[in-house]
């Protein structure tokens, strides 16, 4: 998956390289998150439910934040660039996670995998939008950088944990969880559109 993207990055020119850089960063932190999740699950002797609802949201959201913090500290980007970088990182994280899930579990239940992919992708994009949009605001105010970043990370972790909790619970809650991020994204898009007009 990475080699075609690398070739595309070389062919697209300098303006598009940031996109590919954050795409690779998202995939890389997804891979590292899997190892770190496994380590903490073994360290705390967590069962699948605890690992999914307590460990994974914290590890994954912190890992998605690290490339953004590096970008903010080294390059001091504009607000719109911060938002784009956060969403691209989250989107590539979700894409790689869904590919790993598909490889691990097979395509026997295509409809389940399809809805899981959409729900998980939307959830990661919402978490990325929370962090990216918030960082674009709080990093313009020196006094708010640390507390604001921690608060945004906490909000993203909470949303992610609620999503994972509903998924792990199963039954009707699982299907609500798959629909919830999609509905939130649609509502957010409508609100954003109406505020512009």
Feature names for model-found ranges:
Residues 1-197:
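Hydrophobic alpha-helical segments at protein termini of multi-pass membrane proteins
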């Amino acid at each position: 998956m990475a080699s075609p993207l690398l070739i595309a990055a070389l062919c697209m020119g300098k303006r598009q390289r940031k996109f590919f850089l954050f795409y690779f960063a998202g995939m890389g932190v997804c891979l590292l998150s899997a190892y770190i999740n496994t380590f903490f699950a073994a360290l705390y002797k967590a069962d699948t439910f605890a690992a999914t609802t307590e460990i994974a949201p914290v590890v994954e959201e912190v890992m998605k934040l690290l490339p953004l913090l590096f970008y903010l500290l080294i390059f001091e980007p504009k607000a719109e660039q911060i938002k784009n970088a956060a969403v691209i990182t989250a989107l590539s994280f979700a894409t790689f996670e869904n590919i790993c899930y598909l490889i691990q579990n097979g395509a026997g239940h295509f409809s389940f995998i399809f809805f899981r992919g959409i729900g998980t992708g939307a959830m990661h994009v919402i978490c990325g939008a929370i962090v990216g949009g918030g960082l674009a605001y709080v990093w313009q105010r020196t006094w708010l950088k640390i507390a604001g970043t921690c608060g945004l990370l906490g909000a993203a972790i909470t949303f992610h944990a609620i999503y994972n909790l509903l998924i792990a619970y199963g039954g009707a809650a699982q299907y609500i969880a798959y629909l919830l991020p999609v509905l939130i994204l649609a509502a957010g898009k409508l609100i954003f559109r109406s505020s512009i007009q």
